[in-house]
Amino acid sequence: MPNPNQTIVVRLRNWVGDVTLAVPMLQRLADAGLDLRLVGKGWARDLLAGHGWPVQVLPKTMAERVRLLRDMGRDARRDGSLNGLCLPDSFSSALEFRLAGLRALGHAWEGRSLLLARAVPRPRGVHELEVYWRLGSALLGQDAALPAAIGLHLADSHLAQADGLRHKHGIEPGCILICPFAGGTWNQVDKTWPGFADFVARDLQAFGRRVVVCPGPGEEAIAQAQFPSALMLPGVGLGAYAALLRDAAVMVSNDTGPGHLAAAVGAPLVSVMGPSDPALWRPWGPTVQLLGGDGQWPSAQAVRAAVARTLLGR
């Protein structure tokens, strides 16, 4: 097990869902006394602000990334112990740690074993949260039971931003949030529920609640065209988004990052999955109702019933 206060430079992954699912492992390392120094996408700093970990923005070029990793690890121990944690499985991410002179732990994947100070097999057939949890166990040298919930911390600034949005747009408590978007595909199959627009127009409006959508960059036109009845809040940061979710009556989401975000703050979530494998990628937590998956989309009636169970208790 690393010594208390030992500096560990952590390279985060590039998707909101992945970073969210890694939060319990990162908090476990911090609770063990490790000095975490994170590097990832620009949005990760806002997402993780409530935990107080410093997050550097990942540069675009390899030379800049190596220079940044070297600077971040300047205070790390150089006695042969591990001082890096590489969460991505790419060859380049392991190479950057090696060129920066850091001894990183990561998955034995794509011929990376010679670049990492310690390479462990990537588990197959387990949920992605457990994949990261096991990496934390390997770093600490001890196993621990999987957490029941993610427990994403919100910063005071996140709560203030969410309050400002509610006041500005007249959003009352008990609204419904939707995330009808989906980044990427599953085995080259679109993860966007084909019935989402009709469901919002015909079924969700019947509950008499304000419906809110927070499109990400490039999603505004889809939100406006396909979900005209919803209040659109573009440009909302992930921290404020999480704070809005925490106080929502329910969220209905595709298999995408904001769905994991809702589960991470304990919001009631109806997770609509189609091609994805729920055993590997379902949102994690006790407030999740999972519908579909493994190549099957749920019916609108099933999604409506799940929303009704949350809102009406039946």
Please give the residue ranges for each predicted region:
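Catalytic machinery of carbohydrate-active enzymes
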Residues: 1-314
